[in-house]
Swiss-Prot record:
Signal peptide positions on this chain: none
EC number from the UniProt entry: 5.4.99.-
Organism: Alternaria brassicicola
Annotated protein name in UniProt: Terpene cyclase DEP1
Enzyme class: isomerase
Keyword Membrane: yes
């Protein structure tokens, strides 16, 4: 079996561009979103909020993102919402992974020390495109070789920050589920979600700054305590993400709704075809709205697929006894142990979902450092 390498992150990002944006260019997604942002109304007649900060260019971007996220998170359809819920918890786990790596003592690069910018781009442009490129930088960093430890006060703060990170996706879904506040509140929460990674970073740094610091912060006992906090954070995130994935899969298996079947959720369809030209299951909603749902669901499907592959690659590289930067230069086949780990990761990703499998794998990896 050929070895995994950091170069494969570029292939995954390219696949993300193809699945997210190339298809969107040909299947009418861009045109439909443009129409909605110009008219400020969805095809089903609901209004689209356009004022958030009174800064024109920023409001225009937030309006576009609100239109996108609204269609995939409202209660008008079931299947696309289920998958999008799962996707957002995988990305939430990725938020935690990069936050942990940014807190290691050996990190020197500002790009890696403050990863919020990358996670904001994941929310705004597609995690399938941005996340592989950022994790490439993480894997190629020499920070783990210099000093992989995390200060105890930072590790303690991670436990609380993990809870905050896991609450982030609820900003998108709870307003629609609750049915209160209408589109105005829902779109406001979606806009807040876009900058939530910045808020989490500020919260974490602020919390870490007020926690007491030990004089012997680098002692073996302190490092052991730090490791326990990091492992606990990863296990918590993995448990929640696995529960969300199980909810998605079980819901798809037991439902009689054809819009939420397992193949409907995870198997991409249509591709270059405009969904308006394909016979769709009657739903009582305008055909143009359902075509937009199909456009965005295809986007979400490819997002999930690429992020799943990225999480397997990332966790496998970090589980390896050799550093990712070194592995990329060697032209070897994987050892039997590494091949076994890759198989386990793949199976776990199918069963537990990408967020759960990778988080548990990274918890194991943390114990090896």
């Amino acid at each position: 079996m050929p070895q995994t390498s950091t170069t494969q992150f570029f292939y995954l990002s390219a696949l993300g561009i193809w699945g997210l944006w190339v298809y969107a260019f040909f299947n009418g997604m861009f045109d439909r979103l443009d129409t909605i942002t110009r008219t400020l109304h969805f095809p089903d007649g609901r209004p689209l909020r356009s004022k958030y900060t009174n800064i024109g260019p920023l409001d225009a971007q937030l309006t576009l993102l609100s239109a996108f996220y609204d269609v995939l998170s409202n209660t008008l359809t079931s299947g696309p919402r289920l998958l999008f819920f799962d996707v957002n918890y995988v990305v939430a786990c990725a938020n935690l992974w990069v936050l942990i790596e940014s807190r290691r003592r050996g990190v020197r690069s500002w790009f890696l020390k403050y990863p919020a910018w990358a996670m904001v781009l994941c929310n705004a442009n597609g995690a399938a495109i941005v996340l592989p490129l950022y994790l490439y930088l993480v894997c190629c960093s020499k920070a783990r070789l210099r000093d992989a430890s995390v200060p105890k006060h930072e590790a303690t703060a991670l436990l609380v920050s993990t809870v905050v990170i896991l609450l982030q996706p609820l900003l998108i879904f709870v307003p629609a589920w609750a049915g209160r506040g209408g589109s105005h509140l829902h779109h406001g929460c979606i806009a807040l979600f876009q900058v939530a990674p910045i808020g989490v970073s500020v919260f974490h740094l602020g919390l870490a700054s007020i926690l007491p610091r030990e004089a012997s912060d680098s002692s073996p006992s302190s490092r052991k305590d730090s490791k326990k906090c990091i492992v606990a954070s990863l296990v918590l995130a993995g448990t929640v993400a696995a529960a969300v994935h199980s909810y998605t899969v079980v819901g798809a298996l037991i439902t009689r709704d054809g819009q939420a079947s397992l193949t409907r959720l995870f198997v991409p369809a249509h591709g270059f075809s405009d969904p308006i030209e394909v016979p769709l299951q009657p739903s009582g909603l305008p055909a143009e709205y359902m075509a937009l749902v199909e456009n965005l669901h295809l986007f979400s499907q490819w997002d999930w697929i690429v992020v799943a592959l990225t999480s397997v690659l990332y966790s496998h590289l970090l589980l390896s006894l050799r550093d990712g930067a070194v592995r990329a230069k060697a032209n070897h086949w994987v050892s039997p142990v590494e091949a076994q780990e890759l198989v386990y990761l793949t199976v776990a990703t199918i069963i537990l979902g990408p967020g759960g499998a990778a988080s548990f794998a990274l918890a194991i990896r943390e114990s090896r450092i």
